Amino acid sequence: MKLTTKEFERLMQTVSAGWNEGDARKAADCFSNDAIYVEPPDAQLYHGRAELYEFFGGDSGTDIPMKMTWHHLAFNEEEQIGFGEYTFKLHGQYHGIVVVRIESGLITQWREYQYRTEMNWEIFTSQNPF
């Protein structure tokens, strides 16, 4: 099953909604059972939906709320590879980009690059806003 761009956007919005709502199951269910989640080269590495569920807060949730905002999402329907530019807050604030591979409607690979900063998105991108 190949996702359309709209379905990809819905999937990515579901991940962020799960994080924003403190619902680890909602977010983890967007990933395949054998998903790989990495921040290269090895800042973060998680394997599989069960491990991601715990990373996302598990049954007890995170100690402070997560906040995820997508600024841009793009998707190649043929290759089933998508990108998202985001701001994430948990223990610090990060602006970054993630590249994902989709198979059978779920995220199988997640690779993120992020920059920790206290600047808001508008200031962070002020030299090249869009």
Positions of PLM-derived features:
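Short beta-edge strand/loop motif at the mouth of beta-sheet-based domains
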Residues: 43-54
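Short, hydrophobic secondary-structure boundary micro-motifs
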Residues: 28, 38-39, 67-69
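Short hydrophobic/aromatic segments of transmembrane alpha-helices and their interfaces
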Residues: 34-36, 90-91
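A short gly/proline-enriched turn/hairpin at secondary-structure junctions
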Residues: 36-45, 61-63
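A beta-strand edge to alpha-helix "cap/lid" segment located at domain peripheries
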Residues: 2, 53-130
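Short, low-complexity N-terminal intrinsically disordered segments enriched in polar/charged residues
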Residues: 1-33, 127-130
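Small side chains
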Residues: 18, 27, 35, 82-84, ...
